[in-house]
Amino acid sequence: MKSSNIGGQAVMEGIMMRHGDVYSVAVRKPDKEIEIKVEDYKSIIKSKKILSLPVIRGVFNFIDSLVVGTKCLMYSATFFEEEEDYLRRKNLQGAEKAKEDAKKEKEDKVLMTLTVCFSVAFSVALFMVLPYLIASLLHQIGATETIVTIAEAGVRILLFLLYMFLISKMEDIQRVFMYHGAEHKCINCVEHGLPLTVENVMKSSRFHKRCGTSFLFFVIIVSIIFFIGFFAVVPVQTMWMRVAIRILLVPTIAGVSYEFIRLAGNSDNPAVAFLSKPGLALQKLTTKEPTEDMTEVAIAAVEAVFDWKEYLRENFPETEIPEEP
């Protein structure tokens, strides 16, 4: 199976899809129409050659994904703001509209920056720092640093699974996870040589090896390996230094995890497939079976940035491409 190199994420009542330097956002509006927005986004990686090196590129790809993802979430949310605000902005015209749009764009940039910074800080605190602080309580009963690090690994996995389980039970998030499933189904559909139709998408798998859920799982696993290995070789006596080192290792951990996900998405190797299974299993929590109207939104997002017919002609020449209606 050849990767299509498309990826995306679910947003509020919609899907973001990205291919190369272009991304689209398709949203099912309250009036049931599908709104599609297409924009260019030049990756940070392409600004300097060194940023495209293995591991390093993973760090900056993660930053890119956070920025684009947050921007698209904020855009999708505008369709579901208070009706009074929505109608007021919709009825603005001329200079007044331009002024309001400029003001909103500035506010959105500030909010996006704060959201990305908070998301990173929250994730590092919850999944990197807190597990160690909890496990370090074992020092009080005479546990060695090696035992504490191993216990930290168990706490980290439990916290991650608990977090995933709890958010999967939230009603609003469940709809997002249904759109997440629709996103995966679209990608699986074309990557398995099927024309991108509602019928074909609905019968495709909602699990995909390049998923962000799998990436997060590998961040957890790689962090465990790094921390156990590092502190076994380099004894660190003070707690604040041990916490600081964990934080400093996060970019490297993210970069290594990205390389594995990249490999998994482009390989049918049995060993890689086996290592991908835990991440795929976690997607049972973070993806749900979508409805047909959600699938229509996902297809619209894909078609806005990706020529799936040309992809099928090149990689699956035996596939019969449906003619334009």
Go through the PLM ranges and name each one.
Residues 86-140, 144-169:
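Hydrophobic alpha-helical segments characteristic of transmembrane helices
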Residues 1, 5, 10-11, 46-52, ...:
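Cytosolic juxtamembrane amphipathic/interface segments immediately preceding
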Residues 1-93:
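Divalent-cation
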Residues 53-75, 79, 151-177, 250-266:
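Hydrophobic alpha-helical membrane-embedded segments
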Residues 17-23, 115-124, 175-177, 215:
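Alpha-helical transmembrane segments of integral membrane proteins, especially early/N-terminal helices
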Residues 75, 79, 120-144, 219-245, ...:
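Juxtamembrane "helix exit" motif at the C-terminal ends of alpha-helical transmembrane segments
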Residues 2-7, 11, 15-17, 90-91, ...:
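Polar-ligand-bearing catalytic/cofactor-coordination segments
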Residues 115-120, 148, 152, 156, ...:
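Pore-lining and gate-forming transmembrane alpha-helices of multi-pass membrane transport proteins
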